[in-house]
Amino acid sequence: MQRSPLEKASVISKLFFSWTRPILRKGYRQRLELSDIYQIPSADSADNLSEKLEREWDRELASKKNPKLINALRRCFFWRFTFYGIILYLGEVTKAVQPLLLGRIIASYDPDNKVERSIAIYLAVGLCLLFVVRTLLLHPAIFGLHHIGMQMRIAMFSLIYKKTLKLSSRVLDKISIGQLVSLLSNNLNKFDEGLALAHFVWIAPLQVTLLMGLLWDLLQASAFSGLGVLIILACFQAGFGRMMMKYRDQRAGKINERLVITSEMIENIQSVKAYCWEEALEKMIENFRQSELRLTRKAAYVRYFNSSAFFFSGFFVVFLSVLPYALIKGIILRKIFTTISFCIVLRMAVTRQFPWAVQTWYDSLGAINKIQDFLQKQEYKSLEYNLTTTDVVMETVTAFWEERFGELFEKAKQNNNNRKISNVDNSLFFSNFSLLGTPVLKDINFKIERGQLLAVAGSTGAGKTSLLMMIMGELEPSEGKIKHSGRISFCSQFSWIMPGTIKENIIFGVCYDEYRYRSVIKACQLVEDISKFAEKDNTVLGEGGITLSGGQRARISLARAVYKDADLYLLDSPFGYLDVLTEKEIFESCVCKLMANKTRILVTSKMEHLKKADKILILHEGSSYFYGTFSELQNLRPDFSSKLMGYDSFDQFSAERRNSIITETLRRFSLEGDAAHSWNETKKQSFKQTGEFGEKRKNSILNPINSLRRISITQKTPLPMNGIDEDSGETLERRLSLVPDCEQGEGILPRSNLINTGPTLQRGRRQSVLNLMTHSSGNQGQNIHRRTTAFTRKMSLAPQANLVEMDIYSRRLSQDSGLEISEEINEEDLKECFLDDVESIPAVTTWNTYLRYITVHKRLIFVLIWCFVVFLIEVAASLVLLCLLSKVSPEDKGNTTKSANDSSAVIITSTSSFYFLYIYVGVADTFLALGLFRGLPLVHTLITVSKILHHKMLHSVLQAPMSTLNTLKAGGILNRFSKDIAILDDLLPLTIFDFIQLLLIVIGAVAVVSILKPYIFLATVPVIVAFVLLRAYFLHTSQQLKQLESEARSPIFTHLVTSLKGLWTLRAFGRQPYFEALFHKALNLHTANWFLYLSTLRWFQMRIEMIFVIFFIAVTFISILTTGEGEGTVGIILTLAMNIMSTLQWAVNSSIDVDSLMRSVSRVFKFVDIPTEENKPTKSIKLPKDGQLSKVMIIENQHVKKDDIWPSGGQMTVKDLTAKYIDGGNAILENISFSISPGQRVGLLGRTGSGKSTLLSAFLRLLNTKGEIQIDGVSWDSITLQEWRKAFGVIPQKVFIFSGTFRKNLDPYGQWSDQEIWKVADEVGLRSVIEQFPGKLDFVLVDGGYVLSHGHKQLMCLARSVLSKAKILLLDEPSAHLDPITYQIIRRTLKQAFADCTVILCEHRIEAMLECQRFLVIEENKVRQYDSIQRLLSEKSLFRQAISPSDRVKLFPHQNSGKHKSRSKITALKEETEEEVQDTRL
C-alpha cells in the first residue's frame, strides 16, 4: 500500500481535498488494484482507536455500578464532534440569509426604489460570497462527522471482537452468529451513515426559529400558515412511514421464507440435482416470490406518494403562506421570491433534516445500548492451574451446560395453553421429563499420569466432548475438582482450518522448528498430500480448507494439535473422516509413538484404540459407566458394547434422547413460533443449551460473507438480524439489512453498508455460536495469505528416516510466542486475499446493460415514452403560459406571482391578485396531477422487470452444470438473490424515476431561462458539459473504490465467523492476541478503502458546488447588467438559477446512484447468462428388445408413477470414464472401466482424496465427463439428464433437509399418498420419530431440520431413495458421525428394502464393507483393482492392509459359504451376531 499524500498535504489541499487527485487520475486511466490504495492515517488505525475506547470503557466499568458506553464514547470523541457541529450550523445559517439578499436584489429593480439600484452589484457580490462560505463550511464539516463516525465504528468493532473471544461458552450458546454479525453491521453501520445528520436535532429547530422570524417580518401572521402546512406534511409523511413499516414487516417474512429455501438450495445444489428436484424447488421459491412482490408493490406505491408529496409540497407552502397576505395587501414580487426561497429551506429542515436527525439518534442510542449489553456479558474464566503438576485428575466432577431445564418445559406448556394450540400431541410430553437441570456430566472421577493414554468412549450424547470442554475450562464444573498443568493442545471433532497456508495452519503461531514440523507432517500422513500441491505447504487454504478433502482437513487439524508442545493433548474423535488404513497408520505412528511421552485423552469408539489405551473411561448419559484398563473392562463389564452402543430396540432409546427432541420442539414450536430458526444441531448437549428465549427472538442468516462453495457467513439471512438484545422492540424493517431503508439508499453515494446483506444472508439463522463451533465441517474463510516473519530454524542431528521415533518435544523451544504479524500486508498478499472476490464487471455500467434492462419487458419502453410525453406537456404549458403573460404590461406592478411548482419552477407576472391566484392554482393543480401519477406506471413496470429477472436467474442457476457452479461462490450466488434483487425491487425503481424527473426538470428550466435571457444559455452549456465530464471522471474511480471497499468488507466478517468456529482451539492454544491483530489488519484494510472513498466523494461534491458558484456568479451579473426595468425578470432568472443548479447537482448525484445500482443488474445478467446443462439426448435412443420407446423415455419430473419403467435390473457398465470438476481442469478420474451385475453390492476403496465420492458424482453426470455408462443396456447419451438421474437413489455425505414439512422433504412433487409415505417411514425406522412431533407429516422442519439428529436425517435420505423406487443406490459415507442405533437401521433397511437393487457403497466402517461382494480400489485417480473379496484378501492389496486378522477370520466363513450359495442379493448376507458387533466396534 502506498503512503498517503494526506500526510504531507497543505491546509489548502486538505480543505479542498486536492490530495485525492493522484488516485482519481489513476482510477480514470486504469483499473485500480488494492496496491494503489493509500495507507490509513495512524489516528485511524484499529489498534489506536480500540486501545483508546477500551481504556475509557475499562474506566467506566471500574468507576460505576451501571457503566454507560456512551460516556466512554463521549470522552473519546465529544470535542471533535461538537466542533464540527458548530461549523455545520454556521454553514446552514448562510442558507437562511441568502433569501434576504435575493429579495433586496429584486427590490432594487422596483421602479419606485431606484435608490437601491446602485447597490445591486454589491448585493450580488454578497450573495455569491455566501455561496462560497457555505461551500467552505459544509463540506469539511460533513466529512469530519463522517470521519468521526468511521472512527467510532472501528473502535467498537474491535471492542466487540475482543469481547467475543472472551465470552463463556454458555453465553455463546444463547447468541446466534446472525446476531453477532448484525451487531457489527446493521447497528454499527448507523454511525457511518447517520452521524453527519445527528446535529440537525438541534440545528433544525434553531433554523426553523430563525426562518419563521424572518418570514414574520416579511408576511406577518400569514407566515404561520405555511409552517402549518409543513407540520401537516410531516405528519402525513409519518403516516406514510407507518404504512411502509406495516408492509415491510409483512414483506420481511416473505423475503425470509424465500431466502431460506434459496440459500438451502444453493448450499445443497448438488443434492438437488441428484434428486431431480429442480422444478419442485423452483416452483416453491416462485410462490414465495409472488407473495413477496404483492407487498413490494404496495410498499413502493406508498414510498412513491411519500416522495411525490415532498416534491410538490412547495406549491402548498408558498400558496398558503402568501394567500392571506395577498388578499389583504396585494402581491409584491420581492416578497414572493423571498418567500419561495425561505420555504425551500424551511421545508427541508422540517420534513427531512429534523426527522432524519431524530431517527439517527434513536438508532444510534439503540445500537449503543445493545453493544453495551453485549460488552457486559459473562466472560470465559480461565481455571487456576498448577504448572508443576504432571497428572490429570478429576474428583467427583458434575457440570451443566444449562440449568433449569424444567423451566423451559413449564414456560412452553403455558405458552401452548395461552395460544390454545389444539394440534399438540400429548404424547410429546414424556412423564420422565426432569423438572430440574440435567447435568451433562455427573460424578466423574479419574486420574491419569504423565505419558498415559486415556481413551474416552460412549454412545452419542454421552458427554465425551463436554468432558474435554471441562478440562479446557470452557465448561465450568458445578461440583468437584479438576487438576492439571494448564498447558493444553486440542484437536476438535470437526476440523477447523483458518485462512492461511498449510504450514501456518499447522504451526499456528508457535515458533517454527524444522525437525518437529517434518516429524509431525510425516506422522500425520500429510507428506504425500502436500507434495501434490504446486506450492507444497505454502499453498493457501481458503474457505476453511474447502479445496481439501475431509480427511485432509482432519489430518491438518490433528497436526496442529500435535505440533504444539503441551503437557496434555485432547483429541476429540480426530479420525472420523479417515479411511481405515490411514487411521491405523496415524494412530500407530502419531498417537502411540510420536506422542508416547505425552499425556493424551482420545475420544474414540474403536476397539483397537481401547486395547492400546492405558486407561479407559466409558460414559453413559453423562455418568461414568466404567473406568479402568481394557482387561478389567472385559472382566467387569462383558456387556459394555451392546449396552452402550444401543443395539437394543430403536424405539426404546434413552429418556435423555427423547428429552432432546422435546426441548428442541418446544424451542421451535412453542417459544419462537414461525420466526424460530436454527442450524443443524447434531450433538445432544446442544439441545441442553436453551438459554433465555424471548418471545420476540428473531434470528438471521449471514450476509454476505463470501464463500467458495459454502455460505458464511454471509449472508444466508432469511430472518431479520437483530442485535443481542432479545427483547428489542426494533422493527423488522430496521433490522433486515436485505430490505434497504427508503431514505438511506444502500449502495449509493452518501451511505455505505458494511456487509453484503441478504444473504448477506450468509448462514446462522438462530444457531448459537456454540453450535457453530461444534458443527464446523463447512468452515468458511477468505484466501487471506499472511506472510510470516523469519524464525530461527534449529538443525536436526537425527537421521531423517527415524524422525517419527524421536521425542520431538524433548528440545523445548525458547519461546512459544504467537506468530509475529507486525509487518505491513504487502501487495502480493492483498491480490491473493481478494482473488476470488474481484468481479469481472466494468468500472462504469455499459450502455449495453441499460439497453438490455429496458428491453427485458416491452412495456417499459412505452412507459418511458409516456413519462417523456407528460413532461413535454408540462414544459409546453409553462412556455405557453409564460408567453401569454409576458404580454401583460409590467406597469401593473404590485401583483406578481409564481406559476409553477417546484418541478417546473417557472415564475410569471399578472395584472391582479385574483387573476394571479386563479392561474397559479390552475397550473399547479394540473402539474400536481400529472406529476403524482406519471411515475406510478414506471415504478410498477420496473418491479415487474425485477420479477422477470429473478425468475430467469433462478432458472439459470438451477439448470446450470456443476462444472460452472463449482467456479462460483455460494455466498456470491446468494447475494444475487438477496442484495441485488432487493436493490432491483426497492432502490432502483424510485432512483431511476428521480433521475428522469430531475433531468427533465433541469432541461425544462434551462429552456425557460434561455427564452428569457439567451445570454444565460451560453453560460449554461459549458456548465452542463463540465458537470457531465466531472461525473465521468469521478465515476471511474468512485465505482472502483466502492468495489474495493466491498471486497475489503468481507474479510472482517469472515474472520469473525472463522474465529468463532475455532474459538475453542484459539483458547486452547492461547492465540487470541494473534487473531485480534489479524482482525485489526482486516479492519485497517477496509478503513483504507472506505476513507479514500469518503475523501474522493467529498472532492466530487465540492467541485460540483464550486461549478455552481461560478455559474451563479455569471448568471447573477449577466441578469443585473443586462436587465433594465422589471423586477419580475430578475426574480425569475435568479430563482431559476438557484433551482437549476441545485437540481442539476441532485440529478448528477442521482445519475451516479443509478450507475451504482445498475451494477446489480449487470451481476444479475451475468447469472442469467450461465450456460445450462445439456438435457437432451446426444445419441439416437436404443430401444429395448420389446421396441417400446416409453420404457426408455419419460417426461422430466413426471408426477405420475409408472410401474413398468427403466431400469428394471440395475446392471451397470462403465467404459473409459474420465471426469473433471471444471472445463479445462485436471482429470479427477481417468479411464475408469468396470461392470456391476444386477443386485450386486460394490464397495469403493481408496485413501482420502482418491476420488471415491467424485466417482459417485460422475455416475450422476454432475461433473464434466467423457466415456460411457450403460444401465440395463441404455447409454446415458441416449436419454435425458433428468431421467438418467432418476435411475439412482442417493444417500449423500452431506445430508439435505430443506425448510418444509416432513411430507415435502420426502415427496416434494406430491407423488405418493400418506399411506405409502407412512409405510416407507416404518421401513426405515422414521415412523416413531415423526410421530413425536405435532402435526406428524405436516410438522414444518426449519434450518436444515435442526430438531432431528444426524442419524434421523440420514434416514430421511434413505426414505427418499425407497420412495424413488430406484434400482441403483449410491451411498457416500452414510455412517460418518452416525450413532450406532441409526447405523443398524440403515444396515437393516439396505438388506430388506434394497434386496434386489444394485448398491455402490463408499464407507470407512469395516463391518459395512465386509458385506460387499466386489470392491473397486481407486488409487491416483485410476482403478487399481476390481475384484471379489476373496481375491483381494488373497493378495497384497489396500483392502488386505485395512482388515485386521480378526476381521479376516470372521470373513472367511462368509467366503466359504459364498462358494456354495449365490450372494448376489443383499438378503443373502449373513446377519452379524452381537458378539461380532462387540468385537468390531463400540
UniProtKB/Swiss-Prot annotation:
The keyword Nucleotide-binding applies. N-glycosylated. GO terms for cellular component: apical plasma membrane; chloride channel complex; cytosol; early endosome; early endosome membrane; endoplasmic reticulum membrane; membrane; nucleus. Keywords: ATP-binding, Cell membrane, Chloride, Chloride channel, Endoplasmic reticulum, Endosome, Glycoprotein, Ion channel, Ion transport, Isomerase, Isopeptide bond, Lipoprotein, Membrane, Nucleotide-binding, Nucleus, Palmitate, Phosphoprotein, Repeat, Transmembrane, Transmembrane helix, Transport, Ubl conjugation. Residues 1472-1482 have a biased composition (Acidic residues). The chain crosses the membrane at residues 78-98, 123-146, 196-216, 223-243, 299-319, 340-358, 860-880, 920-940, 992-1012, 1015-1035, 1097-1117, 1132-1152. Its main location: membrane. Residues 81-365, 860-1156 form the ABC transmembrane type-1 domain. It is found in: Apical cell membrane; Early endosome membrane; Cell membrane; Recycling endosome membrane. Glycans are attached at residues 895, 901. One of its GO terms (molecular function) is bicarbonate transmembrane transporter activity. InterPro entries: AAA+_ATPase, ABC1_TM_dom, ABC1_TM_sf, ABC_transporter-like_ATP-bd, ABC_transporter-like_CS, ABC_transporter_C-like, CFTR/ABCC7, CFTR1_ATP-bd_dom1. Residues 423-646, 1212-1445 form the ABC transporter domain. Residues 1-77, 147-195, 244-298, 359-859, 941-991, 1036-1096, 1153-1482 are cytoplasmic. Residues 99-122, 217-222, 320-339, 881-919, 1013-1014, 1118-1131 are extracellular. It is an enzyme of class 5 (isomerase). ATP 1 binds at residues 401, 434, 458-465, 493. A lipid is attached at residues 524, 1397 (S-palmitoyl cysteine). One of its GO terms (biological process) is response to endoplasmic reticulum stress. ATP 2 binds at residues 1221, 1246-1253. Binds and hydrolyzes ATP via the two cytoplasmic ABC transporter nucleotide-binding domains. The two ATP-binding domains interact with each other, forming a head-to-tail dimer. Normal ATPase activity requires interaction between the two domains. The first ABC transporter nucleotide-binding domain has no ATPase activity by itself. Belongs to the ABC transporter superfamily. ABCC family. CFTR transporter (TC 3.A.1.202) subfamily. Monomer; does not require oligomerization for channel activity. May form oligomers in the membrane. Interacts with SLC26A3, SLC26A6 and NHERF1. Interacts with SHANK2. Interacts with MYO6. Interacts (via C-terminus) with GOPC (via PDZ domain); this promotes CFTR internalization and thereby decreases channel activity. Interacts with SLC4A7 through NHERF1. Found in a complex with MYO5B and RAB11A. Interacts with ANO1. Interacts with SLC26A8. Interacts with AHCYL1; the interaction increases CFTR activity. Interacts with CSE1L. This is Cystic fibrosis transmembrane conductance regulator. It comes from Dasypus novemcinctus (Nine-banded armadillo). The gene is CFTR.
